[in-house]
Amino acid sequence: MTVVTPVAVAQPNGSDILVGSGQPLLLIGGPCSLESEQLGREVAETVSKICKKLGISYVFKASFDKANRTSISSYRGPGLKKGLASLARIREDLQVPVISDIHDISQVGPAAEVLDIIQIPAFLCRQTDLLVAAAKSGKPVNVKKGQFVSPWDMENAIGKLRDAGSDKVMLVERGACFGYNNLVVDMRSLPVMRSFNCPVIYDATHSVQLPGGAGGSSSGQREFIEPLSKAAIAAGIDGLFMEIHPDPDKALCDGPNSIALDQVEELLTKLVKVRAAVEE
């Protein structure tokens, strides 16, 4: 298995999380969109405790703006200013690192003041100016592989970031288009992208999404979260990305492919066992 140089992610307490070969599994998890600060706190606090118990590193994720929703009427989030303020309070009060996605260059500066990791959405993974601006922020950059991009083509995205001065790059596999309104996961992409000396994270929830499959919104098949996550762990990933909600059926964004908060501990416990078996 390829040895990947760990990426350091700052924590509120001043220490670093290390993501890569020989390091604890990373979980990036939280609601798709920051529906409310209270909901975000509930998820962050609960998942943080679970991860500490299981020896998993944790970064809380929630979007302040979902700029790529299927319909104009879809809920997008609290917006840049309010959303970042909520994320800053969650970070400080719960002492958990935070990540969110940016959609244009103007958001990089404000986001970098709050976020511990800047995320590039899948649809924007080839946007050179956005990647360069994110790299120059000095923060670790988590790039989601577009559903339309091959794993080997992501070496170009890494090249843009590294050329702009960043050596803190992580990649996320979130499935590939399989005809219309469907995604599949090619597990070969995980070792391919790790071969670029870059930690690779598997998006366990977006990978089971059915994009636009519900007409005015996306649908999903959350029953496949567990088996595909086990396969990704066995393939040697460095981390997992999960959208987590207390009541996915009532979520304002990506509910059909989110995992329920009360199911997280059971799933992570199984995945830790799979990782331990693979590492023996």
UniProtKB/Swiss-Prot annotation:
Record's keyword annotation contains Ribonucleoprotein: no
Tell me where it mainly resides.
cytoplasm
Q: Does the keyword Transcription regulation apply?
A: no
Task: Tell me the compartments it is located in.
Answer: Cytoplasm
GO CC annotation = cytoplasm
Listed under GO biological process in this entry are: keto-3-deoxy-D-manno-octulosonic acid biosynthetic process
Which reactions are catalysed by this chain? Answer: D-arabinose 5-phosphate + phosphoenolpyruvate + H2O = 3-deoxy-alpha-D-manno-2-octulosonate-8-phosphate + phosphate
Q: Which domain of life is it from?
A: Bacteria
Q: What PANTHER family does this protein map onto?
A: PHOSPHO-2-DEHYDRO-3-DEOXYHEPTONATE ALDOLASE (PTHR21057)
In terms of NCBIfam families, this protein maps to:
KDO8P_synth, PRK05198.1
Regarding protein family, the annotation reads: Belongs to the KdsA family.
Q: What is this protein called?
A: 2-dehydro-3-deoxyphosphooctonate aldolase
Q: Which organism is it from?
A: Desulfotalea psychrophila (strain LSv54 / DSM 12343)
Gene behind this protein: kdsA
